[in-house]
Amino acid sequence: SGVPYSLGEPFFDSAESVIAHMLFSVPGVKGVEFGDGFEGAKRRGSERNDMIINAEGATLTNNEGGVNGGITNGNDIVVRVAVKPTPSISLEQRTYDFERGEVAPLVVGGRHDACIARRAQVVVEAMVALSLAELRLREG
């Protein structure tokens, strides 16, 4: 919250593009959506348009997730990411062994996070903050 309106550009350096670029740089991130995202894509425009309710530009809803046409609109930035499960698990798996030239059992040793999603939340929030700072600096 507290993001000013007018950060971003309509093309290439849109607020969504800059944020998504940073988020997809986080290992394990496989998807990014803004506002009502993929669910909103199933609805009609008349059902999900964010109605402006006053001269300051406040909206009744925030289906766009704080960004319209690539530019922040003053609403809260709402972004969600999908993080893949960690592949380094303690269960035996089967995979190709290049030394032996065949599919063989693999057991990953050492200490690994069973779930990276909890740690990813802090990193995702930081990346969004850095993205917004970058957009603010581009304003001049």
Name every feature range the model reports, one short phrase each:
Residues 78, 86-140:
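Internal helix-turn-beta structural module
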